[in-house]
Each structure stands twice: as C-alpha cells, then as structure tokens.
Amino acid sequence: NDVITVQTPAFAESVTEGDVRVEGGTPLFTLRHNLKLGFMSAFVKASAFALQEQPVVNAVIDDATKEVVYRDYIDISVAVATPRGLVVPVIRNVETMNYADIERVEVRPMMYVALTYDHRLIDGREAVTFLRAAVEDPRVLLLDL
C-alpha cells in the first residue's frame, strides 16, 4: 500500500570510521578544569558540529502537518556502561557546551513531576521553582527543614 509506505519512517543507519586520538593538551586541560579529557566529549562535540553543519540530520517530520521541523537545539544520547548496567543519558543543548561542560556530565537518577495550577495566580517560574524544590531536595518538605 502506497499510503503506508509514505507514512512509515524508513530508518537507515550509516557507519564510518574516524581517527579519534586525543593528542597533546590533555595535561593542560586536566590542570585547568580538574577533569580528565576523554574520547566521548570529542565525539559529542564533533557530532554537535556535524549536526549544525547538516541541520536536516537533526530534523523531524511533524506527523500532523507533514512538514520538516528543524530543531534549534542538539540533544545527544551516549550509552555508558555502569556497575548497574548500560545507562543512556541524554546530554541536552550540546551546541552550547564546551569540552569541560561535557566531561562534567554525570548520570543521576531523574524523575518527572507535574503540577497543575491556576495560571491567573501562578506564573511558570514559581511553579518550576516549587517543583524543583520538591524533587531535588524532598527532605525540605518531608522533614520540615
């Protein structure tokens, strides 16, 4: 059926090889940022640069309008082996980060929370401040600290 063919994404994968040696400058980087410079930050930065140069690779097709939507941000997921198994954190807004910012990314337990409120009384800033306080340090609310 031609309709199904047009509506179903045709995913493909391309693989290539590249030299990822990190040479020189690493002792200075470690001294300046108190971080070890790894291959992953170079890979993430290179990917972000390539996505900025070829924005169609970071685009999506809007299901409702069937239009191509070019994202103005770059989020990259990287699989990381941990003692608990494979974890795939999302590094958000990579295009705004430098190598040190990327090396500082750490896997932390995350949780989504929502708050329904009367927007006539509460602005988004206050709602988010409340939610972050409740999630990031629940001891404050639970233990009346």
Swiss-Prot record:
For the keyword Mitochondrion, the answer is yes
Q: Where is the active site?
A: 119, 123
Q: Can you cite a GO biological process for this protein? A: L-lysine catabolic process to acetyl-CoA via saccharopine
Where it sits in the cell: the answer is: Mitochondrion matrix; Nucleus
One Pfam family this chain carries? 2-oxoacid_dh
> What are the GO cellular component annotations?
mitochondrial matrix; mitochondrion; nucleus; oxoglutarate dehydrogenase complex
Q: Does the keyword Mitochondrion apply?
A: yes
Q: What class of enzyme is it?
A: transferase
Q: Which pathway does it take part in?
A: Amino-acid degradation; L-lysine degradation via saccharopine pathway; glutaryl-CoA from L-lysine: step 6/6; Carbohydrate metabolism; tricarboxylic acid cycle
Q: Which cysteines are joined by disulfide bonds?
A: none
Q: Name one GO molecular function term.
A: acyltransferase activity
Q: Which residues carry this modification: N6-acetyllysine?
A: 36, 66
What are the alphabetically sorted keywords of the record?
A: Acetylation, Acyltransferase, Lipoyl, Mitochondrion, Nucleus, Phosphoprotein, Transferase, Tricarboxylic acid cycle
Q: Which cofactor does it need?
A: (R)-lipoate
Q: Where are the transmembrane segments?
A: none
SUPFAM superfamilies listed in its UniProt record? CoA-dependent acyltransferases
Instruction: Spell out the reaction equation it catalyses.
Output: N(6)-[(R)-dihydrolipoyl]-L-lysyl-[protein] + succinyl-CoA = N(6)-[(R)-S(8)-succinyldihydrolipoyl]-L-lysyl-[protein] + CoA
For this protein, the Enzyme Commission number is 2.3.1.61
Cofactor binding note from Swiss-Prot or TrEMBL:
Binds 1 lipoyl cofactor covalently.
Q: Which residues form the Lipoyl-binding domain?
A: 4-31
InterPro entries in alphabetical order: 2-oxoacid_dehydrogenase (IPR050537), 2-oxoacid_DH_actylTfrase (IPR001078), CAT-like_dom_sf (IPR023213)
Q: How does it assemble?
A: The 2-oxoglutarate dehydrogenase complex is composed of OGDH (2-oxoglutarate dehydrogenase; E1), DLST (dihydrolipoamide succinyltransferase; E2), DLD (dihydrolipoamide dehydrogenase; E3) and the assembly factor KGD4. It contains multiple copies of the three enzymatic components (E1, E2 and E3). In the nucleus, the 2-oxoglutarate dehydrogenase complex associates with KAT2A. Interacts with ABHD11; this interaction maintains the functional lipoylation of the 2-oxoglutarate dehydrogenase complex.
State the protein's purpose: Dihydrolipoamide succinyltransferase (E2) component of the 2-oxoglutarate dehydrogenase complex. The 2-oxoglutarate dehydrogenase complex catalyzes the overall conversion of 2-oxoglutarate to succinyl-CoA and CO(2). The 2-oxoglutarate dehydrogenase complex is mainly active in the mitochondrion. A fraction of the 2-oxoglutarate dehydrogenase complex also localizes in the nucleus and is required for lysine succinylation of histones: associates with KAT2A on chromatin and provides succinyl-CoA to histone succinyltransferase KAT2A.
PANTHER family in alphabetical order: DIHYDROLIPOYLLYSINE-RESIDUE SUCCINYLTRANSFERASE COMPONENT OF 2-OXOGLUTARATE DEHYDROGENASE COMPLEX, MITOCHONDRIAL, DIHYDROLIPOYLLYSINE-RESIDUE SUCCINYLTRANSFERASE COMPONENT OF 2-OXOGLUTARATE DEHYDROGENASE COMPLEX, MITOCHONDRIAL-RELATED
Which family would the database say this protein is a member of? Belongs to the 2-oxoacid dehydrogenase family.
Q: What is this protein called?
A: Dihydrolipoyllysine-residue succinyltransferase component of 2-oxoglutarate dehydrogenase complex, mitochondrial
Q: Which gene encodes it?
A: DLST
